[in-house]
Design a protein with these regions (language model features):
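Short catalytic helix/loop segments, enriched in acidic residues and glycine
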Residues: 22-37
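Conserved alpha/beta core of the MobA/IspD/sugar-nucleotide pyrophosphorylase nucleotidyltransferase superfamily
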Residues: 2-5, 157-253
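Conserved core of the sugar-phosphate nucleotidyltransferase
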Residues: 108-184
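N-terminal nucleotide-binding beta1-loop-alpha1 segment
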Residues: 1-21, 70
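Nucleotide and nucleotide-moiety/phosphate-recognizing core
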Residues: 30, 45, 51, 59-66
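Residues at the starts of beta-strands that form the adenosine-phosphate
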Residues: 4, 49-51, 97, 202
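A short, N-terminal amphipathic alpha-helix
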Residues: 33-50, 90
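Conserved beta-loop-beta/alpha segment of the NTase-like Rossmann-fold superfamily
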Residues: 63-135
Length: 254
């Protein structure tokens, strides 16, 4: 079965300022690899050759990917005013048997090399201990999501990627086309929009270890994973700070 992927890369990631003044978060070098390039290579390794990347903020920084990896870029010029649902909307014609990814996630192991003989649609999830701000989920004995909450405690939560099969994609696309111009719908995360139609859209929980999918929330979070990040960030801002303070990058703290 042929599968494709849509990588969402339009956002600004303002919690990584000032570094995102120079380049988008998806272009950060982490442990010697560009985040989005690592993800593209993992998709290609799994046989997913049709890859669409939705760009917006500093879109020109991603142009080289077309020639280097043969990906298809889709421009979302309204990234600053709208949620990532709108990025899926501008890529809606490509939704089929599709992985939905974010450019700035780091998959320790390749999650796209998998067994899914029934081709079910799923959302990657992990168990969080304590309070969290991600989308929490409740699910049935059959592992079908039955409720979505914003934040939670000591429960399963959405993390990383999702997979839509062709039937799910057709329904999701239809709902987007019907509702995208309604008040505040375009401002939503796609997960919020899915939650509105949860009874009509069956999405399974696929559990991952909480150390296998990383979503860096800030610079210090990233540095805990890659202690050499500031040495490899290729930032004029860091260079200027080091010049003024006469220090090396790893001596800089928040």
């Amino acid at each position: 079965m042929k599968k494709n992927a849509v990588i969402l890369a339009a956002g600004k990631s303002s919690n990584f300022a000032p570094f995102t003044y120079e380049k988008p978060k998806g272009i950060f070098c982490v442990k010697g690899e560009i985040l989005i390039e690592r993800q593209i290579k993992q998709l290609l390794e799994a046989g997913v050759e049709e890859i669409h990347v939705v760009v917006g903020y500093m879109k020109e920084k991603f142009f080289y990917l077309e020639e280097k990896y043969g990906v298809h870029l889709i421009v979302n010029n309204t990234f600053a005013e709208k949620g990532n649902l709108y990025s899926l909307y501008v890529a809606r014609e490509y939704l089929a048997n599709t992985y939905i990814c974010c450019a700035d996630h780091y998959f320790v192991d390749n999650p796209f090399i998998e067994e899914n003989p029934l081709n079910y649609s799923y959302r990657a999830c992990t168990f969080y201990q304590g309070k969290f701000r991600e989308f929490g989920v409740a699910y049935s004995d059959a592992m079908v999501i039955t409720d979505v909450s914003v934040g939670g405690m000591d429960q399963m939560a959405m993390v990383g990627h999702a997979y839509f099969n062709e039937s799910f994609s057709a329904k999701f696309r239809n709902y987007m086309e019907q509702e995208i111009d309604r008040f505040r719908v375009a401002d939503m995360f796609w997960e919020e929009f899915y939650a509105k139609h949860l009874k009509e859209l069956s999405l399974y929980v696929k559990e991952f270890d909480n150390r296998s999918i990383l979503e860096f929330e800030g610079i210090e979070d990233l540095r805990q994973f890659d202690s050499e990040f500031l040495l490899n960030v290729d930032s004029d801002i860091i260079s200027n700070i080091c010049s003024v303070l006469k220090c090396n990058p790893n001596e800089i703290n928040e």
